[in-house]
Amino acid sequence: MQALVNKIWYQGHPLRWLLLPLSWLFAVITYVRRALFRLGIKSQTVMPVPVIVVGNITVGGSGKTPTVIYLIELLRQHGFTPGVVSRGYGVDIQGVKTVNLGASAAEVGDEPAMIVARTQVPMVVGAKRVDAANALIAEFGVDVIICDDGLQHYALGRDIELVVIDGQRGLGNGLLLPAGPLREGAWRLDAVDFIVNNGGPAAKGQFEMQLAPTEVKPVKCDLTSGEYSFDKSQPLVAMAGIGNPARFFESLRAQGYQLALCQGFDDHQPYDKTQLRDLAQDLPLLMTEKDAVKCRDFAQENWWYLAVNAKLSPQFDEQLLARLREVAAAKQGNFHGIR
């Protein structure tokens, strides 16, 4: 099914025209929804600290999670105390839930588990991001909130909108769901503060981001503190349950890994030991960091993951920090006046 969807969205398959009436209906629904917030019929909650929303206008992976991790580290380096809120995709969360270090993907979602494992950032997940943001401030006293994948969640007021787009796939056929991959029209890019192009080339007004691979590490938790080595010249099985698995496989080939088999899975898909053991047979299994957080409890000794770090320009850092400081100063003045 996913292969057919990709053909419709990214390869000009004629079935897109049959789905176009549904896309028109989707366009009306999204327009009305935005209008309700713009007219004040539906309320938007303004937080006492700056809110940075990281999202995209397409369905599927574009590099949001590495961008969130990059922002966490950037803000910390410049004296901020950031926290993160997220929906916790695929997890039925009643109310809100704090993401503790070591939390499983089944409890909080794979991306929140990965973000906290990597950064130990204060993080709260919940279906209502406003409730999650309030809990984050009350429990941790953060001074900046990063909202992971909340561009279309208009109930949460935002001060800075950052959209990540896939430099390889772009906006696909440019059509709204379900005929195309767009959650909102391309016009939405004109309304955001920052556009990050994952992989480039960046168009005018965009900032190029590259994902730099780190060292290969064992998935099995009790191996991470010991000595280990990985021979990239040996044949291996590669797997990826992300929005664009092909991108991961292409990156591995470019780095010289010998891929005997590549297996893509649906984004956020859960795994079990038997499934992956049968996939790998006796070969090493190499996966993404996001996949690894779902496999730690049953990982084999020859299962590995490759993490990536986002790289952005100093110009991006300077402009984002300048904008954030402006917002923070205005918020302090406004809320001090209210008190």
Curated annotation (Swiss-Prot):
It holds the Pfam family LpxK. Pathway: Glycolipid biosynthesis; lipid IV(A) biosynthesis; lipid IV(A) from (3R)-3-hydroxytetradecanoyl-[acyl-carrier-protein] and UDP-N-acetyl-alpha-D-glucosamine: step 6/6. ATP binds at residues 58-65. Keywords: ATP-binding, Kinase, Lipid A biosynthesis, Lipid biosynthesis, Lipid metabolism, Nucleotide-binding, Transferase. It is an enzyme of class 2 (transferase). One of its GO terms (biological process) is lipopolysaccharide core region biosynthetic process. It catalyses: a lipid A disaccharide + ATP = a lipid IVA + ADP + H(+). One of its GO terms (cellular component) is plasma membrane. Its EC number is 2.7.1.130. One of its GO terms (molecular function) is ATP binding. Transfers the gamma-phosphate of ATP to the 4'-position of a tetraacyldisaccharide 1-phosphate intermediate (termed DS-1-P) to form tetraacyldisaccharide 1,4'-bis-phosphate (lipid IVA). Belongs to the LpxK family. This is Tetraacyldisaccharide 4'-kinase. The gene is lpxK.
